[in-house]
Regions:
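A ubiquitous short alpha-helical element
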Residues: 25-31, 93-97
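Mature N-terminal segment immediately following signal peptide/propeptide cleavage
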Residues: 32-59, 66
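Catalytic glycan-binding domains that act on GlcNAc-containing polysaccharides
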Residues: 52-197
Length: 197
């Protein structure tokens, strides 16, 4: 075989198995937002390289659009936009303290959590109280959409993409469907508002 032909065949075979080449088999997003669509197209190769199956990626990215409610929300977080004393006055209230004291005594799962995970109940109670008001405010944002919006904005791209990949792995494993992955605008979910990773 001629060296030039052999080199051409080798290059074609390498391109056929590379993440960048795999990316082109996925349908592009068409949100109407050029920045978001460019990010989504670029991200697909990284998701495939991280082990996300092409069919999962194509299904979950199909029809994905930026969430206008998320845009700019990270600059308005009360814990970062208020003086700490004002923030604490709003979250450490007599009602919340009373609920915490009742929950501390009532929740039967605390001994198991403390033993299995090494998390003291008072730490868990504090997180539970501050993050979701003991589960009363968990958010209803589509976690994948929120994280994709943050990634496309660029300021927190690396962090958000890591969380998107973690979200896609949860979906891919069958642990939870995307419809159950709901939470805050920042991608935090559940009663303790933990992020996907």
């Amino acid at each position: 075989m001629r060296p030039r032909l052999a080199l051409s065949l080798l290059l074609l075979s390498v391109c056929a198995i590379s993440p960048a080449a795999s990316q082109s088999i996925l349908p592009p997003t068409a949100s109407g937002d050029m920045i978001f669509d460019a990010w989504a197209s670029d991200f697909q190769g990284r998701a495939l390289a991280a082990g996300i199956a092409p069919e999962v990626l194509a299904r979950e990215m199909a029809g994905l659009t930026p969430d206008p409610r998320v845009a700019g929300a990270d600059s308005r977080q009360p814990e970062f936009s208020k003086p700490i004393s004002d923030y604490l006055k709003g979250v450490v209230t007599p009602d919340r303290l009373a609920i915490g004291q009742r929950r501390r005594a009532d929740v039967a799962a605390f001994p198991d959590i403390e033993t299995r995970f090494g998390v003291p109940r008072d730490v868990l109670l504090g997180v539970w109280a501050l993050e979701s008001g003991f589960g009363s405010i968990q958010g209803d944002y589509d976690t994948l959409r929120s994280l994709a919006t943050l990634a496309a904005q660029g300021r927190r791209r690396d962090w958000a993409e890591g969380e998107i990949i973690a979200t896609l792995k949860i979906i891919q494993s069958g642990e939870q469907p995307r419809s159950r992955l709901r939470g805050s605008w920042a991608g935090a979910m559940g009663q303790t508002q933990f992020i996907p990773s």
